[in-house]
């Protein structure tokens, strides 16, 4: 089993798809990596030689920011926006949608479950 950037790649899948299991590498980046190294994208992960796996590992380590390093960078960027106090930072801080979506309805994923409305106990008073 090939292990690249701390991720075990699936054995029976094509290497082009297998590389997308690494956080930060999608289909286009995967294709670019394989094209640069001259590896056939249709090759199964199991069929790669140890040398090819090492080449992929070296290229990803040198050129791309993946996994923990990328997650850290993303969280630091969000933290920076929150510290600046800009509009996007405030939206992150309040847990609301950041990219201009409506919030009157929808946005339930970002806002969380609905809070129950408080009901009055007595109802209408009689004289």
Swiss-Prot record:
MF-aspect GO terms: rRNA binding; structural constituent of ribosome; tRNA binding
GO biological process terms, semicolon-separated: translation
UniProt cross-references to InterPro entries, sorted A to Z: Rbsml_uS13_C, Ribosomal_uS13, Ribosomal_uS13-like_H2TH, Ribosomal_uS13_bac-type, Ribosomal_uS13_CS
Keywords of this entry: Ribonucleoprotein, Ribosomal protein, RNA-binding, rRNA-binding, tRNA-binding
GO cellular component term, pick one: cytosol
Region span, Disordered: 95-127
Listed Basic residues bias regions: 108-127
Family the UniProt entry places it in: Belongs to the universal ribosomal protein uS13 family.
Subunit structure: Part of the 30S ribosomal subunit. Forms a loose heterodimer with protein S19. Forms two bridges to the 50S subunit in the 70S ribosome.
Function: Located at the top of the head of the 30S subunit, it contacts several helices of the 16S rRNA. In the 70S ribosome it contacts the 23S rRNA (bridge B1a) and protein L5 of the 50S subunit (bridge B1b), connecting the 2 subunits; these bridges are implicated in subunit movement. Contacts the tRNAs in the A and P-sites.
NCBIfam families: uS13_bact
Protein name as it appears in the record: Small ribosomal subunit protein uS13
Organism whose genome encodes this protein: Desulfatibacillum aliphaticivorans
Lineage of producing organism: Bacteria, Pseudomonadati, Thermodesulfobacteriota, Desulfobacteria, Desulfobacterales
């Amino acid at each position: 089993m090939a292990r690249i950037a701390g991720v075990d790649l699936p054995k029976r899948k094509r290497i082009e798809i297998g590389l997308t299991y690494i956080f930060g590498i999608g289909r286009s980046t995967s294709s670019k990596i394989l094209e640069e190294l001259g590896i056939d994208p249709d090759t199964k992960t199991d069929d790669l030689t140890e040398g090819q796996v090492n080449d992929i590992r070296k290229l990803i380590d040198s050129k791309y920011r993946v996994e923990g390093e990328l997650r850290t960078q993303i969280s630091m960027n969000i933290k920076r926006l929150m510290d600046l106090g800009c509009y996007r930072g405030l939206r992150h801080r309040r847990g609301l949608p950041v990219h201009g979506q409506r919030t009157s309805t929808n946005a339930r994923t970002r806002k969380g479950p609905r809070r129950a409305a408080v009901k009055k106990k007595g109802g209408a008073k009689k004289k």
